[in-house]
Structure formats: structure tokens, C-alpha cells
């Protein structure tokens, strides 16, 4: 995929360019004061030109080319005012031109990888996830309703504690069984398993809130 100029690191930027979307462009400047400097912290909507000089680690992360990492850098990103789960496909998906067809072909390869690797609930957690998230009925009309249901379930049944020790072997299972409170890592991990339970590919990532 890399040889065909496709990467999940700037996938939305490619799609946006082909769709001629009119999202707001913003320049973001980063001053890394405490995070690991060997990685670059960018959003999903970063433009290709801003990440092409970094080391793209498949669909995992972006690594700095600098020997001791990068402290200060900037990039351009495009933000939509709508939640990502509400995004709808562009009309050209049904009748693509040559460039759009090339994108669709490479995206299909990556999509197959995603569904093969990010759609299965971790072994041993299937019944626990089903018990927690299926106890309340909801109208499943797609990804938006599922996202809201997961938020509602976590808010209703789980307790937050930023000081939770996440080092024990069965910490996620204990959290899902409501034996312990959870921090941001456990809430995010539970949400990933829940999305997979509802057949939506998801994976755990770490990041920062940009305000």
C-alpha cells in the first residue's frame, strides 16, 4: 500500500481531496514538553505532505526521523463540524474516475486487513462484554446509535478513577465485571471491545485532546 501512496495515517486527507470536501483547514503547532519525542502526535485528518518525511509504522504510529526525537513541529489538518460516526460516503464512490478508483482499490486492501484484525473481541472476554453491553436494549440503526449506546452503558454502570492500577493481569476483566473502577485506559479498552462486539472494527490508541 505504501508503494501505491496509501496510508491510514493520511487516509482521510486523500479521501477529502478526491471528494473535494470543504472542511476547515487548521495549522497546528506542537511543542512536546513531556510525551515520548520519538513519536509524532497527529490527528487522523493530517495532510499527507506533513507526514511523508516521518517514518510511518504501518497503521500503528509515526516515528520521528531525528536521532533524539522531535520536540517542535507543525502540520495542517482538516476538521469537520460533524462527529466522524455521522460521515457519509461521497457520490463518486459509485462512479469513480481513474484516481478515485485507485484509492478505492488500495482502501479495499486495507479494509480487509482491518476487518481481519480489529473486529474480534479478545479471547475470554466475549461473554463478559455481551453481559455488560447487551443488558439494556437499544435501537441499533448503525454506528452512531451503537456509539451512543456504548457511551451510555459505560456512564451508567462503570466508575472512573484516574489512579486505578492497570498493571495486574486481569485488570480489564475485573473492570468489565465491575469489581474495580477504571481509568481512561480501561474505559477506552472496554469501548474497543464493545465496538467489536457489535461487528465494528476498532483498536486501542493513545492520544491527546486538542483544544
Predicted segments, located by residue:
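Sequence-level detector for tyrosine residue identity
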Residues: 10-15, 39-44, 73-75, 103, ...
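Weak global preference for isoleucine
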Residues: 18-21, 28-30, 46, 51, ...
Amino acid at each position: 500500500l505504501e508503494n501505491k501512496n496509501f496510508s491510514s495515517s493520511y487516509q482521510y486527507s486523500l479521501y477529502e481531496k478526491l471528494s473535494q470536501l470543504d472542511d476547515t483547514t487548521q495549522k497546528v503547532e506542537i511543542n512536546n514538553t513531556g510525551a515520548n519525542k520519538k513519536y509524532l502526535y497527529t490527528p487522523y485528518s493530517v495532510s499527507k505532505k506533513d507526514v511523508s518525511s516521518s517514518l510511518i509504522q504501518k497503521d500503528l504510529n509515526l516515528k520521528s526521523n531525528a536521532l533524539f526525537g522531535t520536540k517542535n513541529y507543525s502540520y495542517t489538518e482538516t476538521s469537520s463540524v460533524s462527529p466522524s460516526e455521522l460521515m457519509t460516503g461521497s457520490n463518486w464512490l459509485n462512479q469513480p474516475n481513474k484516481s478515485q478508483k485507485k484509492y478505492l482499490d488500495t482502501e479495499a486492501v486495507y479494509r480487509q486487513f482491518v476487518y481481519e484484525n480489529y473486529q474480534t473481541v479478545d479471547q475470554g472476554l466475549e461473554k463478559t462484554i455481551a453481559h455488560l453491553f447487551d443488558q439494556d436494549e437499544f435501537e441499533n440503526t448503525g454506528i452512531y446509535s451503537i456509539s451512543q449506546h456504548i457511551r451510555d452503558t459505560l456512564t451508567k454502570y462503570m466508575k472512573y478513577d484516574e489512579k486505578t492500577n492497570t498493571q495486574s493481569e486481569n485488570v480489564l476483566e475485573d473492570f468489565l465485571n465491575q469489581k474495580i473502577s477504571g481509568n481512561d485506559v480501561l474505559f477506552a479498552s472496554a469501548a474497543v471491545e464493545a465496538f467489536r462486539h457489535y461487528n465494528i472494527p476498532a483498536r486501542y490508541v493513545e492520544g491527546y485532546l486538542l483544544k
